[in-house]
């Protein structure tokens, strides 16, 4: 086996092992988040709404406003609201 082949193999193994460690950390974090939602639910909070709030906080104000305007337009088209708000 050539030395270059061995180096490539070692690098590949190192990448794979790093990915595996990160995947395990990701699973642990996901489990922790699930536990927090469970705690919140136990205190009477609606977890679906909490998840929406978390998603909204990730977006900037302009992005949220654009999405809300599009949503209002769709709801109006379906007759679910009177008219989209004037902006």
From Swiss-Prot:
Domain of life of the source = Bacteria
User: Per the record, a Pfam family?
Assistant: GapR_DNA-bd
Which GO terms fall under molecular function for this chain's record?
DNA binding
Which residues fall in a coiled-coil region? none
- Write out the similarity annotation: Belongs to the UPF0335 family.
Q: What is the designated name of this protein?
A: UPF0335 protein RHE_CH03546
Q: What is the source species?
A: Rhizobium etli (strain ATCC 51251 / DSM 11541 / JCM 21823 / NBRC 15573 / CFN 42)
């Amino acid at each position: 086996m050539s030395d270059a082949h061995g180096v490539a193999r070692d690098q590949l193994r190192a990448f794979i092992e790093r990915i595996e460690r990160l995947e395990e950390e990701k699973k642990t974090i996901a489990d922790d988040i699930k536990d927090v939602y469970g705690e919140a639910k136990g205190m009477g909070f609606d977890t679906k709404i909490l998840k929406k709030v978390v998603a909204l906080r990730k977006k900037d104000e302009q992005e949220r406003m654009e999405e809300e305007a599009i949503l209002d337009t769709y709801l109006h088209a379906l007759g679910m609201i009177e008219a989209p708000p004037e902006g």
